[in-house]
Amino acid sequence: MTALSNMKCEACQADAPKVTDEELAELIRMIPDWGVQVRDGVMQLERVYKFKNFKLAMAFTNKLADLAEDEFHHPGIFTEWGKVTVTWWSHSIKGLHKNDFIMAAKTDQLLA
């Protein structure tokens, strides 16, 4: 399979299929630092990134904002001193789509 970070997001409509359990098991192995959370019945990907100070955390947040705009897929972002929590899910389908895994991999690359 092509590296997730090399893929582009596709338009996700309300009738797009959520990832299957089998797809979830395969895709989550490709982004090992991410976890799956369920909030209000909605499955989401989440990772906490740690930084030495607030300025570095904010710089990462701004890079992530640019990436999200470029891909037209937007995460939940919680920025605080030394830490940024990023949550990906597809709002239109209220769950996980392959786009979320692509964006998680691209988010990881922002640290490179």
Curated annotation (Swiss-Prot):
PANTHER family: PTERIN-4-ALPHA-CARBINOLAMINE DEHYDRATASE-RELATED. It comes from Shewanella baltica (strain OS195). It is an enzyme of class 4 (lyase). NCBIfam families: PRK00823.1-1. One of its GO terms (biological process) is tetrahydrobiopterin biosynthetic process. It catalyses: (4aS,6R)-4a-hydroxy-L-erythro-5,6,7,8-tetrahydrobiopterin = (6R)-L-erythro-6,7-dihydrobiopterin + H2O. GO terms for molecular function: 4-alpha-hydroxytetrahydrobiopterin dehydratase activity. Its EC number is 4.2.1.96. Keywords: Lyase. Belongs to the pterin-4-alpha-carbinolamine dehydratase family. This is Putative pterin-4-alpha-carbinolamine dehydratase. It holds the Pfam family Pterin_4a. The keyword Signal does not apply.
